Amino acid sequence: GCPWDPWC
């Protein structure tokens, strides 16, 4: 996931 969005 992304640092700002765990669902990326």
Curated annotation (Swiss-Prot):
Gene Ontology molecular-function annotations: ion channel regulator activity; toxin activity
Main location: secreted
Disulfide bonds: C2-C8
Family that this chain belongs to: Belongs to the O2 superfamily. Contryphan family.
Name under which the protein is recorded: Contryphan-Fic
Entry domain remark: The cysteine framework is C-C.
A GO term from the CC aspect: extracellular region
PTM annotation, UniProt: These peptides are not hydroxylated and not amidated, and no D-amino acid are detected.
Species for this entry: Conus figulinus (Fig cone)
Tissues in which the protein is found: Expressed by the venom duct.
Subcellular location: Secreted
Function: Its target is unknown, but this toxin may modulate voltage-activated calcium channels (Cav) or calcium-dependent potassium channels (KCa).
Keywords for this protein: Disulfide bond, Ion channel impairing toxin, Neurotoxin, Secreted, Toxin
